[in-house]
């Protein structure tokens, strides 16, 4: 998944070679609200489920595993019941202008858990 699109890709192995086939592509932009930019986590989940259903239908239900590849600078916090505590902010949100997000995240996590 990237900042503007995501896709579900099937990896096929014939015993000697791995080939990749795109099964589903979807738009993946942010959602603006109150001068902030968020990820639409529920839409992303729905798109991924659609792609996995298409993959299962295309390959006779033979989906053996699932992996996710993403830029990975954003995060959502989960509560004790594994519920999402709030809408994840998009890394292109104005609060990140000129900042080194990875360093900020590490600093915040240290302060929360130490």
What do these predicted ranges mean?
Residues 1-42, 83-94:
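Short glycine-rich, Thr/Ser-proximal phosphate-binding strand/loop in the N-terminal lobe
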Residues 16, 33-64:
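Conserved active-site "lid/cap" helical segment
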Residues 53-114:
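Glycine-rich phosphate-binding/catalytic subdomain of phosphoryl-transfer
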């Amino acid at each position: 998944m990237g900042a503007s699109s995501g896709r579900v890709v099937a990896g096929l192995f014939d015993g000697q070679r791995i080939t990749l086939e795109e099964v589903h592509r979807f738009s993946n932009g942010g959602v603006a609200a109150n001068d902030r930019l968020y990820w639409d986590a529920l839409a992303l989940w729905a798109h991924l489920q659609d792609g996995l259903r298409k993959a299962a239908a295309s390959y006779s239900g033979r989906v053996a595993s699932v992996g996710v590849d993403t830029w990975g600078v954003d995060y959502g916090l989960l509560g004790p019941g594994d519920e999402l505590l709030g809408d994840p902010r998009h890394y292109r949100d104005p609060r990140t202008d000129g900042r080194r997000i990875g360093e900020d995240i590490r600093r915040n996590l240290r302060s929360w858990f130490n």
